[in-house]
Amino acid sequence: MYTIGQVAAMFQLPISTLRYYDKEGLFPYLKRKAGIRWFSEQELEALRVIECLKKAGLEIRNIKQFMQWCTQGASTYPQRYELFVRQRDAVEAEIRHLQRTLDMIRYKCWYYENAMADGNEERVKTLTPAEMPQEIR
């Protein structure tokens, strides 16, 4: 069993975040003794899932719904599946967007590296895509 401070340190989260998750009902089996929250391995696993889902872009209300579905057993598999399909699609779209951003940044790095080597932008400005390295086009 772990105190809220220990869990906060383990997950590098503010204590206030753990209190908020508790208030939102994300730790339904959390034990309290003399006003102290005691986190078991079950809560630690729930927290791992919560943090993963947050990083994937799920809002707390959706995470809460997912956690409730998990307690309801196999009958909620279709809902859980749909939740993850939607989130997968959203994450894949974000990855595509970030890839385009990274491509532009790589191009600008290449562009200014060449401009610095030449002492100006004149040559690099007039290059056609066919004259650029494959990874920059």
Say what each PLM segment does.
Residues A8, L26-F27, L44-E45, Q72-S75, ...:
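A generic structural signal for solvent-exposed, polar alpha-helical segments
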Residues K55-E82, R86-Q87:
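Amphipathic alpha-helical dimerization/coiled-coil segments
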Residues M1-Q68:
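Basic helix-turn-helix/winged-helix DNA-binding cores
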